[in-house]
């Protein structure tokens, strides 16, 4: 047995004292949500391809890793300062327990949600005895933990991948490559997110079309477009340069999906304008109306190194300083990396059939044949869980001929 994994069936996520009490008023700024938008906006500047990221999870991981630090370690002060400035979490402020409690509540929602398969595994490389704080991560943070025997990158990645495959119930295959791990690493985290939405309404497969997705006036590619007509939350706001529609998930879900497209200019202008306040404003002003949706059928698979991303924003203490106490009777170590993989599937599957209308031409149109943003969010406080965009066509190998122009809803004509 090369990788010792601690797996608990249930997760009492955070331990609180009896003195922990919620705020009497909601927070003026939702820092959890703002970090999600900030990270997405900064990341997309250098990311010209299709994108999906779970910023929610990256922040949660580092909030949880606070328990592996000790105040007497000088490096802890640098980490705390960067948590406050970059990840917008102040471990010395008045609200750390409230923040952790909120993560606990959201994690419980995710555990009940069958549209998500999410797994986080923290592995320490070495034979030395591990600290109790490290072994407690499953209880305190719902992070699986493992002890990985040193070996070649090929050996270690194979053992690590076997553990990820096991705890994700075969959802995540071949998570690490040999280039993700080396003999010098002491501490590594893998973060896997798979979203395959079970919608409230089934897309009508008989009305699937083959149409062009237009990146710009010179770049396009054929994709299969799904079709749905139903009463949905929809909004068109020229003052905010956005057209939006909500695709609700199945009955009882705590999560939903929002699609947004620019009504003028390009998608970069829309992305730069987004923050949590704007997202809430858009959502609050949307209204239910008969809406036709055409959405590309696609699967995105995106892999990130959190180290390379976060260091660009000034968050480097976790990776450069010996700050995490994972070995007993040994000095602290830096975190090698957090490797995040996101798989997002947009497909037909729905809980119920859409209503049949006599006149199918009436109603709003949301035709996603140009770059658009998608947000998978928690419905109570509108916190983004996964956010990203589709900007280039992903043409299936077995794509058929293009449908006629009317079936493709008269796609955009760029000037």
Curated annotation (Swiss-Prot):
TM ranges: none
CDD domains, A to Z: serpin
Subunit relationships: (Microbial infection) Interacts with Zika virus envelope protein E and Zika virus-like particles; the interaction does not affect Zika virus replication in human endothelial cells and keratinocytes.
Cited SUPFAM superfamilies: Serpins (SSF56574)
Gene Ontology annotations for the cellular component aspect, listed alphabetically: extracellular space
InterPro entries: Serpin_dom, Serpin_fam, Serpin_sf, Serpin_sf_1, Serpin_sf_2
Protein name, UniProt field: FXa-directed anticoagulant
Source organism phylogeny: Eukaryota, Metazoa, Ecdysozoa, Arthropoda, Hexapoda
Glycosylation sites: 117, 166, 216, 320
Miscellaneous field: Patients with dengue virus or Zika virus infections during the acute or early convalescence phase have higher levels of IgG serum antibodies against the protein.
């Amino acid at each position: 047995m090369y990788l010792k994994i601690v797996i608990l069936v249930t997760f009492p996520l955070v331990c609180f004292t009896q003195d922990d009490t919620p705020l009497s008023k909601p927070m003026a700024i939702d820092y959890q949500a703002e970090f999600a938008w900030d990270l997405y906006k900064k990341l997309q500047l250098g990311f010209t391809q299709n994108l999906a990221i779970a910023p929610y999870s990256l922040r949660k991981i580092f909030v949880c890793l606070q328990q592996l630090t000790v105040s007497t370690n000088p490096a802890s002060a640098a980490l705390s300062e960067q948590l406050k400035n970059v990840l917008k979490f102040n471990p010395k402020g008045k609200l750390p327990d409230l923040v952790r409690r909120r993560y606990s509540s959201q994690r419980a929602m995710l555990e009940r949600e069958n549209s998500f398969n999410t797994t986080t595994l923290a592995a320490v490389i070495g034979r030395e005895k591990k600290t109790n704080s490290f072994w407690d991560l499953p209880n305190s943070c719902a992070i699986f933990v493992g002890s990985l025997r040193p070996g070649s990158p090929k050996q270690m990645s194979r053992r690590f991948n076997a553990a990820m495959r096991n705890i994700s119930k075969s959802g995540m295959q071949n998570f690490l490559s040999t280039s993700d791990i080396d003999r010098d690493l002491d501490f590594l985290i893998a973060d896997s997110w798979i979203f395959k939405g079970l919608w409230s309404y089934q897309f009508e497969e008989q009305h699937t079309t083959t149409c062009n997705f237009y990146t710009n006036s010179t770049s396009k590619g054929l994709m299969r477009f799904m079709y749905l007509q139903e009463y949905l939350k929809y909004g068109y706001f020229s003052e905010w340069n956005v057209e939006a529609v909500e695709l609700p998930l199945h009955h009882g879900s705590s999560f939903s999906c929002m699609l947004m497209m620019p009504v003028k200019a390009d998608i970069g202008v829309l992305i730069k304008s987004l923050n949590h306040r704007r997202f809430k404003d858009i959502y609050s002003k949307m209204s239910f109306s008969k809406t036709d949706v055409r959405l590309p059928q696609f699967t995105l698979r995106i892999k990130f190194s959190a180290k390379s991303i976060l260091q660009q924003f000034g968050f480097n203490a976790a990776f450069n300083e010996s700050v995490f106490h994972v070995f007993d009777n040994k000095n602290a170590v830096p975190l090698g990396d957090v490797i995040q993989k996101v798989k997002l599937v947009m497909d037909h599957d729905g809980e119920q059939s859409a209503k049949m209308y006599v006149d199918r031409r009436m109603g709003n149109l949301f035709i996603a044949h140009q770059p658009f943003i998608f947000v998978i969010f928690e419905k109570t406080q509108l916190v983004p869980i996964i956010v990203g965009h589709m900007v280039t066509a992903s043409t299936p190998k077995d794509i058929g001929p293009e449908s006629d122009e009317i079936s493709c809803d008269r796609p955009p004509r760029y000037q």
